[in-house]
A protein has these predicted regions:
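N-terminal leader/targeting and assembly helices and adjacent pre-domain segments
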Residues: 1-205, 287-304
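Acidic, glycine-rich two-metal-ion catalytic cores of nucleic acid-processing enzymes
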Residues: 178, 189-294, 299
Length: 304
């Protein structure tokens, strides 16, 4: 992050101190560390649940080409029970770890209630998590079929799964099954990992073909939003008049981040950050001496 900033303030705004600037930058860095920790935890859980599903599937003597979760009712019920457990564990982890200082945060209840409303397709967090878990399950189904086709025993399949959940459809085992010319029942082998929007029924746009990647990204994004909302609530309590957004990285982002940088955002506008799933922009709150200020756009919206 840049060490110095130049900011032309409109009249009626108290200038922030260097301590304010340093704290604002450090807050986003601390948030990034929390994101990485949560992503690692989610990834570990997904590997654990993939193993549970693989071990269940290997108990049933189903040949690779005929294999799918629906090939045996008992197996399907066992797998779905595991997926239900996964949903509960992920939601609990994401909600608990996404709030800065956890239950010590005085806004904990409000942030948890707000988090529950977040999601894709105008749905909430639970629906979104279920949706991505469904996509993840299709990957595990394809993985089992491919490992069986490769002749792997259950332990080798489990060990292999831990390194390819985010690259499954370019792994040698899955590629071998897809290119074999044989008919498979596992959906991921048939489609090559392509998944479809549940409403348009067209190939999904803007999502990874890997369910594990979607779940990790969603967890990180949810935490980032919670941290920025928590900071915003604290600023409201302190009577701040608004804030400025500054770039936290030099990555080109002219169509999103740059458009929000360098101009005054009144508190009534709400919190705009994070602006995308990997946004590192930081927010500098300022006090208003004369009520609400008209939005002011600085001539140079870039990080200095």
């Amino acid at each position: 992050m840049a060490q110095d900033i130049t900011l032309k303030l409109p009249s009626g705004i108290s200038a922030p101190t260097q301590e304010d600037i340093t704290a604002a930058k450090e807050y986003v860095l601390e948030r990034s560390r929390a994101e990485i920790a949560l992503a690692s935890a989610v990834d570990g859980i997904l590997k654990e649940y993939a193993e549970r599903m693989i071990r269940v599937c290997y108990k049933y003597n189903i040949d690779p080409q005929s294999f799918s979760f629906g090939a045996n009712d008992s197996m399907r019920q066992e797998v779905y029970a595991i997926l239900d457990d996964l949903l509960e564990e992920l939601l609990s982890l994401i909600e608990e770890d996404s709030v800065p200082q956890n239950r010590k945060n005085k806004h904990y209840g409000a942030i948890i209630s707000w988090l529950a409303t977040l999601g894709t397709h105008n749905k909430d967090l639970k629906w979104t998590t279920q949706y991505y878990i469904s996509r993840f399950s299709k990957d595990v189904e394809a993985l089992v079929a491919a490992m069986k086709y490769a002749g792997y025993d259950v332990n080798k399949a489990v060990n292999r799964s831990k390194s390819i959940l985010h690259t499954l459809y370019i792994s040698p085992e899955v590629l071998s099954a897809m290119k074999s010319g044989k008919m498979f029942n596992a959906e991921g082998i048939i489609s090559g990992g392509t998944k479809y929007d549940p409403f348009t029924h067209k190939p999904s746009v803007g999502l990874s073909k890997y369910g594990a990647t979607n779940l990790v990204t969603m967890a990180r994004s949810t935490l980032a939003k919670a941290w920025m909302e928590s900071e915003f609530m604290e600023a409201e309590d302190e009577g701040m008049g608004g804030y400025y957004v500054f770039r936290g990285s030099s990555y080109p982002c002219s169509h999103i981040c740059d458009l929000e940088c360098g101009w005054f955002h009144p508190m009534s506008m709400g919190m705009v950050c994070p602006l995308h799933s990997s946004c590192q922009c930081w927010v500098l709150y300022v006090k208003s001496d004369k009520g609400e200020i008209t939005n002011y756009r600085n001539l140079n919206p870039y990080m200095l």
